[in-house]
């Protein structure tokens, strides 16, 4: 299969294929934090994230959520449908952690009911600033109807993901989603992994995600491996 590099992001490299309708997303071992200011490498990181994303995409698809996922070509190469990415990061917060506790008088660990949903402008140049509907409309990055659909889809993903992870002893304080347009519909894109979610151990509250790297909380490799063991135990058999 043809592999023509389209672009390389912080953690994945995207390639064109012989099929104009599909792309290859290669999950790399790169680690970044603070908008790329902190960088590192972790052996098997791309493998764990790819396999976690695959399993979660399959679960969501089985529950009626459309995604860009097609299949795995290798352990780290995901075949995906090409979509027109909407330049909005949709963040869903179930438990207060991270920036919300620094910007607002909300203590870490506070249960957020209903979940807090936030839009950020997907732009490294501008530091991913928070959006409201009016700014998104002014930027021309989505219609009012699309913004409503993004909210609906993100909350549906949350409804499915929280109990799915809870059964595996994982709490989901918050996570980031990206969506794209395809054939007149909005579908889930990017990845759902230790890079895009906060995962806490249900018993201990310990971080099992990129915060371990971001804030030097311990062994990042063990954290990602533990999440993979709980979500995709079959890859360790």
UniProtKB/Swiss-Prot annotation:
SUPFAM superfamilies assigned: SAICAR synthase-like
UniProt xrefs under PROSITE patterns: SAICAR_SYNTHETASE_1, SAICAR_SYNTHETASE_2
Catalysed conversion reaction: 5-amino-1-(5-phospho-D-ribosyl)imidazole-4-carboxylate + L-aspartate + ATP = (2S)-2-[5-amino-1-(5-phospho-beta-D-ribosyl)imidazole-4-carboxamido]succinate + ADP + phosphate + 2 H(+)
Keywords: ATP-binding, Ligase, Nucleotide-binding, Purine biosynthesis
Pathway: Purine metabolism; IMP biosynthesis via de novo pathway; 5-amino-1-(5-phospho-D-ribosyl)imidazole-4-carboxamide from 5-amino-1-(5-phospho-D-ribosyl)imidazole-4-carboxylate: step 1/2
EC number: 6.3.2.6
One BP term from GO: cobalamin biosynthetic process
InterPro entries: SAICAR_synt/ADE2_N, SAICAR_synt_PurC, SAICAR_synth, SAICAR_synthetase, SAICAR_synthetase_CS
Disulfide topology: none
GO molecular function list: ATP binding; phosphoribosylaminoimidazolesuccinocarboxamide synthase activity
Alphabetized HAMAP family for the sequence: SAICAR_synth
Family listed: Belongs to the SAICAR synthetase family.
Protein name: Phosphoribosylaminoimidazole-succinocarboxamide synthase
Organism: Methanosarcina mazei (strain ATCC BAA-159 / DSM 3647 / Goe1 / Go1 / JCM 11833 / OCM 88) (Methanosarcina frisia)
